[in-house]
Amino acid sequence: MKQIHVIDSHTGGEPTRLVMKGFPQLHGRSMAEQRDELRELHDRWRRACLLEPRGNDVLVGALYCPPVSADATCGVIFFNNAGYLNMCGHGTIGLVASLQHLGLIAPGVHKIDTPVGQVSATLHEDGAITVANVPSYRYRQHVAVNVPGHGVVHGDIAWGGNWFFLVAEHGQRIELDNREVLTEYTWAMLKALEAQGITGENGAPIDHVELFADDPNADSRNFVMCPGKAYDRSPCGTGTSAKLACLAADGTLAEGQTWVQASITGSQFHGRYERDGERIRPFITGRAHMTADSTLLIDEQDPFAWGI
């Protein structure tokens, strides 16, 4: 019987399953190499951890790893029901909160190695967590995509740790009771982007769509479609970073000014940025709450031992 020790949390409603031990040892010299090794040689562990019958489509996984940098607290690899993520803002907040829950870290600044570079996270005395994300930028502005059944939609392409297509004018009602319509609309948009060869820089696939609307209690409300056809319950850390990059490029948000980003569930992240050459360094603040400390069991006689 194989065992996987996990800590479950949620950040603004979006769950993170942190794997503390039980996965195969990885040997890559960088987190990107270790992610590729996990994907190519040990992907069944991701499936066992996140897919039914132990998981669900909404879960985001985070594998706790030894750091590859001398000054880092740890390394991390993020994954979901469909595959692997470059970076995850809500997951980083969940990671830090979980490590505090386990007594492994104290308030202060903690550097974390990820497949797309090192980020830092500040655990504040009151439990809030601020992630200094990877340098972010807008790649293209006002890009047209023809979405079957919906016509031409325009959006910006931006990097915030993942590639996003950000749409402000869409004619959709961003409310929780409209989530099924929003899911089908944004999924059709993702498929249209792929079919029409619209990508991030150097041909990188765009795997997130972010819609925006007004919110009476925040600067904006969003709906974020993630790879795997699950919507983000949180305001999305990498998505908020991509939004900050667009606001900075438009000159509509000053350096250091706070942007309050609400999600479709009503949870909020507070974001700001600093200039970093031609890019920006986003700072995303939120909170995570623990939901479980448990052991997943894998019985290899189980026909669904490695997921459905």
UniProtKB/Swiss-Prot annotation:
E.C. code: 5.1.1.8
PANTHER family in the record: TRANS-3-HYDROXY-L-PROLINE DEHYDRATASE
Role: Catalyzes the epimerization of trans-4-hydroxy-L-proline (t4LHyp) to cis-4-hydroxy-D-proline (c4DHyp). Is likely involved in a degradation pathway that converts t4LHyp to alpha-ketoglutarate. Can also catalyze the epimerization of trans-3-hydroxy-L-proline (t3LHyp) to cis-3-hydroxy-D-proline (c3DHyp), albeit with 200-fold lower efficiency.
One MF annotation (Gene Ontology) recorded for this entry: 4-hydroxyproline epimerase activity
NCBIfam families named among the record's database cross-references: PRK13970.1
Domain of life: Bacteria
Catalytic center residues: C88 (proton acceptor), C236 (proton donor)
Gene3D superfamilies in the record: Diaminopimelate Epimerase, Chain A, domain 1
Enzyme superclass (EC): isomerase
Protein keywords: Isomerase
InterPro entries in UniProt: Pro_racemase_fam
Residues bound to substrate: G89, H90, H208, D232, G237, T238
Reactions the enzyme catalyzes: trans-4-hydroxy-L-proline = cis-4-hydroxy-D-proline
Name of the protein in its database record: 4-hydroxyproline 2-epimerase
Family: Belongs to the proline racemase family.
Organism the protein comes from: Pseudomonas putida (strain ATCC 700007 / DSM 6899 / JCM 31910 / BCRC 17059 / LMG 24140 / F1)
